[in-house]
Amino acid sequence: MNEAFELFSKNIKDRLETNVKGEVTIWFVDDELHIKIYNHGLKFRIVFQNLTAMVVYGRMVPDRIVEEVLGKYRAFIMNKYFN
């Protein structure tokens, strides 16, 4: 894992854990970026697939969490790690 990704993943993990008051795990699988969030009994994954599409797995995912990832990080993730 390169240094830039380590710094990025720590930054997004810290931000998300603060904003959602939950546990956040981030990892890569091939060309997919996975963000798993466990929050007050809700567990879900946000996966950036095929470099452009985003899929959310889980039920009752709070809109503010999805917006946090989409609004703040989606463009950065795509530009920094997939271009």
Indicate residue ranges for each PLM-predicted region.
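Negatively charged, low-complexity tracts enriched in Asp/Glu with abundant Ser/Thr
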Residues: M1-F28, V56-G71, A75
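Short intrinsically disordered terminal tails
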Residues: M1-E3, K80-N83
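Acidic, low-complexity, intrinsically disordered interaction modules
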Residues: T25-R64
